UniProtKB/Swiss-Prot annotation:
Keywords: Cytoplasm, Methyltransferase, rRNA processing, S-adenosyl-L-methionine, Transferase. HAMAP family: 16SrRNA_methyltr_H. S-adenosyl-L-methionine binds at G37, G38, H39, E56, F87, D102, H109. This is Ribosomal RNA small subunit methyltransferase H. PANTHER family: 12S RRNA N4-METHYLCYTIDINE METHYLTRANSFERASE, S-ADENOSYL-METHYLTRANSFERASE MRAW. It is found in: Cytoplasm.
């Protein structure tokens, strides 16, 4: 398990943004999605006087990050909570120089998390980032939601053109058996798809839709955006890395709605990964980085 590490995406671009506003004293960088600490480690290594707050809800992943960042223990503090809860409860009277939110799922969850995020492994169908929080699981959804609910979920959150065919196959299957595992669901989806070649696995969009719904990803992002902006210091930067069009649209529209004399959008078009990065970090293919600077106190 120890050798599975998440490679941070668009790392050089994040560092370049930090460089534009870095102050040698009292600079605070908030990593809203610490994961295994890749972005934070790079920032702490490059800037000797920077302090980091790392937010990570998954305590297993957080412990892995702490191991990776042990040499920086005097300059980093941790919060084991969701990022929207952190800003609601703990930072009402603080201002931060840089806030980063990388909305991708850690490689740990895909490779060894055991929660059914990946159809490449035969795991229990769960997809909750933190199961002890309770809430609905992917297993609950595929085995209890009715036809209309499933079709809407898969189409709207996954952009899946064949949502009706997939749902029909799911409903037929569960007449006989419960859908227990990620590989089981993947097989059902693949059989429902037309017999032609596609660039991505037929199950990709459905799995995305389930993960988004289970973890309340879009509403959590919507709740967080005004909190992040409110907690920036003057000349502070908010940088957000998204991985699908639904997230990117939310961020884009929020930035567009900000008052122009109080905020400066730093990315007229989103920053995407270079050809070189795509070669060594496949996860970066769909990553988009948008950033905005706050111009007032």
């Amino acid at each position: 398990m120890g050798d599975i590490f998440h490679i941070p995406v668009l790392l050089e671009d994040v560092i370049n943004l930090v460089e534009t506003i870095y102050l040698d004293d009292g600079f605070v960088f908030v990593d809203c999605t610490l994961g295994e600490g890749g972005h934070s480690k790079a920032v702490l290594s490059k800037y000797q006087n920077i302090n980091v707050i790392g937010i990570e809800r998954d305590d297993v992943v957080l412990n892995r990050a702490k191991e990776s960042l042990v040499e920086f223990s005097k300059r980093i503090s941790y919060s084991n909570t969701w990022f929207d809860d952190f800003f609601c409860k703990y930072s009402l009277h603080r201002r931060f120089n840089f806030i980063l939110a990388d909305l991708g799922i850690s490689m740990f969850h895909y490779k060894v998390g055991g929660r059914g995020f990946s159809f490449l492994e035969d795991e229990k169908l769960d997809m909750r980032l933190f199961p002890s929080d309770g809430g609905i699981s992917a297993y609950d959804i595929v085995n209890t939601f009715d036809k209309e609910m499933l079709e809407n979920l898969i189409y709207e959150l996954g952009g899946e053109y064949y949502s009706r065919r997939i749902v029909k196959a799911i409903l037929e299957y569960r007449k006989i058996n419960k859908i227990q595992t990620s590989r089981e669901l993947q097989r059902i989806i693949c059989k429902a798809y037309p017999n032609v070649k596609f660039k991505i696995n037929p199950a990709t969009k459905t799995f995305q839709a389930l993960r988004i719904y289970v973890n309340d990803e879009l509403d959590r992002l919507k709740r967080s955006l005004p909190l992040w902006i409110a907690n920036l210091s003057k000349n502070g930067i908010l940088a957000i890395i998204t991985f699908h069009s639904l997230e990117d649209k939310i961020v884009k529209e929020f930035f567009k709605g900000l008052t122009k004399d109080q905020y400066c959008i730093l990315t007229k078009k989103p920053i995407t990964s270079s050809f070189k990065e795509k070669q060594y970090n496949n996860a970066s293919r769909s990553a988009k980085l948008r950033a905005v600077k706050k111009l007032y106190e």
